[in-house]
Amino acid sequence: FVDAYLAPVQDTLARLAKRVRQREVVRTARAAQVPGTDRADRMHPDTVFRLIDELTPADVIHVVESTSTANSFWNTVDISHPGSYFSAAAGGLGFGLPAAIGVQLAQPRRQVVASIGDGSANYGITALWTAARHEVPVVFVILRNGTYGALVSFGDRLEATNLPSFDLPGIDFVDIARGYGVPAYRACNADELRSALTEALASGKPALIEALTFHN
């Protein structure tokens, strides 16, 4: 059992804020993290999020639907502005792409970057048409590891083997995006991703980047 209190929100938060100490624990812990190592033809998710964090404005808004890379995101991305993170957690599949468009429409003066797993992206891919049709300048980054990473992780924890239909071969998100009218790029390494992100962010238009990664 716990104690519960009924109090005015604004007054309560103001009083609580005065009692909170500023700490650097998170930054110190991040500094001690050893980033993941890229492969010859694919990036570690750490690399993807590091470059997103480096190249985007300080007030960028992140919309995230990539469950299996959550640790990489939180260990790498620095969020210091209110209202800068949106995620469905376990609320349902396909949230990320359309939600990013909604957030961008609601916050036209801030850049929205949507980091979406390839498994999740397939559940809401038609949102790209809306982005193109209404020129909503979201930058969509599809982390393409070729598998339902979250389900693979669950299988590992349950010591289940030979599970079918977890792989996602043969999906070309670059061609799909261009078919909807969204400029698209493919990045296999940090240099290619840096170039693609720089161009996409400067365009002021919707863009999709297929970032080739591996399940970690």
For the regions a language model picked out, list residue spans one by one:
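Thiamine diphosphate
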Residues: 2-6, 13, 71-216
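N-terminal donor/sugar-recognition subdomains of glycan-related enzymes
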Residues: 5-8, 42
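Flexible, glycine/charged-enriched surface loops at secondary-structure junctions
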Residues: 11-28, 208
